[in-house]
Amino acid sequence: MSLNFTGFSEDTLDFQQFLREENWSKDSWDENSKEIWRKNVKPEINSLLSVCASDISERTEFNFQSDIARGWNRGGPTKFFWGAVVPQNGHRHTNIQLFIALRSGYVRAGLFLEDSIKAKAAWDFAINSMKNNEQQVSNVIEQASIIGINPCIPLLPKQKGTPIPTKIDPKSNLWSTTFENHKQIDILKAWKVGDPILRNPNFANEIISVFMELMPLYRIISNPEVFD
């Protein structure tokens, strides 16, 4: 896996929009699509993830690795392309994700965890930790929002990648309750695919900055045993 990220290509940035126009049909995953995935999308996401995993492993007390999702499944191409930085020997479906996602119209990056069967242990630990550290969690989220990193509402599979920030639960005024209601934690920054920075190798630094801004929250909600 290359540690050299040279920026996203036009083929990569345009690919999800094309698939969206084709309604992600099985027929749209033809030989040309497979070649774009193999030669552009997959290696570019992989290289960006590996740069980020290496960098934040050096900057923090954690050891990270990259983990990329497939671009297709039995139903056809996936509604977005994504991968994540996860604990060494971890998995994107069971651990907190420091993720990168190419979703129609946007590149998104941030911290994600879902209340799912596979991630149940990580989810329960994260929510309980939030409840015990509500003020610290609120401080991190408030600070991150200054540079455009915000908690967002869940999206349906076919929705565009437009980030829709969420507000804290008005009754409890607690972020833990907000995320419990959403059944996921999704705190992110997004760039429109037309943004020139996406085509620049320095975009890796943008992603690393997002991950490091969220690292105080990661420390609060991650179970240290997953790094043992």
Predicted regions and their residues:
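A generic structural signal for short, non-catalytic loop/turn and secondary-structure boundary residues
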Residues: S57, E61, G76-T78, H93, ...
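Long, solvent-exposed, polar/charged low-complexity segments
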Residues: M1-E31, E35, K39-I56, P154-D228
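Amphipathic, interaction-prone secondary-structure segments
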Residues: F64-Q97
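Glycine-rich, compositionally biased intrinsically disordered regions
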Residues: E44-P77
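Functionally constrained cores in energy, signaling, and assembly domains
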Residues: Q16, D67, E134
